[in-house]
Amino acid sequence: MVFYLVGLGLGDVTDITVKGLNIIRRCKKVYFENYTSLLSFGFDQTQIEKFYERPIIEADREFVEQKIEKVLEESLNEDIALLIVGDPFGATTHSDLLIRAKQIGVSVKVIHNASILTAVGCTGLQLYNFGSTVSIPFWTDNWEPDSFFEKIIINLNNGMHTLCLLDIKIKEQSLENILKKRNEYEKPCFLTCSQAAKQIIKIIERNKGNLVVNADIFVVGIARIGWDDQKIVYATLRQLAFEVDMGIVHW
């Protein structure tokens, strides 16, 4: 029996490969991982099940982190698919799943698809000229991590571009709800290009005089790549932060 990691691409349900669709329709169970990314319409279980012609089980962060072992064990006796937006290896979480499955003797097959890691080529920037990819997290009132910025500077000094992946929060709990053990979740939220640019400018201001970069450096902002209304903007970091409206990232 096989545990399938099936990439769905970047747009909607129709972006799946023919191979991936055939696998979904013959698997005993099908799970949809919905916390590392989302399709253009969010997680609409009815729409997904109608197109794939299969019952779909939602796999949120809590499920993948705490209950996936049972799914892997079931894969020893039946074919199971985990659907992943983009390409299965676009997030380290899924690489870990592959390793864990192999450790208990589960056969794993991967069905690849489009990923933002390659689709960023739509900006006109050459993929060969990208350095390390970074993730920019949401800042809070008392937590402003900036370790990602060091990689941006290293790439810049080496004449390389940096792909910055912006944070998303899907079905997550507040610290208060976690401490009080309340099964309540925050509304989905997505870090925008504007917010990320403002955070970077704040980091630059903290290190004023020690950097060769400033808020007038040119950057490319991209949103909803692979969707019908994708947007690409070339502007200064300052313009992206305060003047450019990239629109909503998701619904």
Each language-model region and where it sits:
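A short acidic, often aromatic-flanked loop/helix-cap motif at beta-alpha or helix-coil junctions
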Residues: E62-I68, I116, K171-E172, W227-D229
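Class I S-adenosyl-L-methionine
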Residues: M1-S107
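Conserved beta-strand termini and adjacent loop/short-helix elements that scaffold enzyme active sites
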Residues: A59-R61, I111, I222-R224
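A contiguous loop/helix-start segment that scaffolds small-molecule binding in enzyme catalytic cores
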Residues: D79, L156-W251
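Short, surface-exposed amphipathic charged segments that create phosphate/polyanion-binding patches used
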Residues: E69-N77, C122-L127, E144-K151, I178-R182, ...
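Class I SAM-dependent methyltransferase SAM-binding "motif I" and its flanking Rossmann-like core
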Residues: G86-T162
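Structural motif
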Residues: V2-Y4, K28-K29, P55, D79-L82, ...
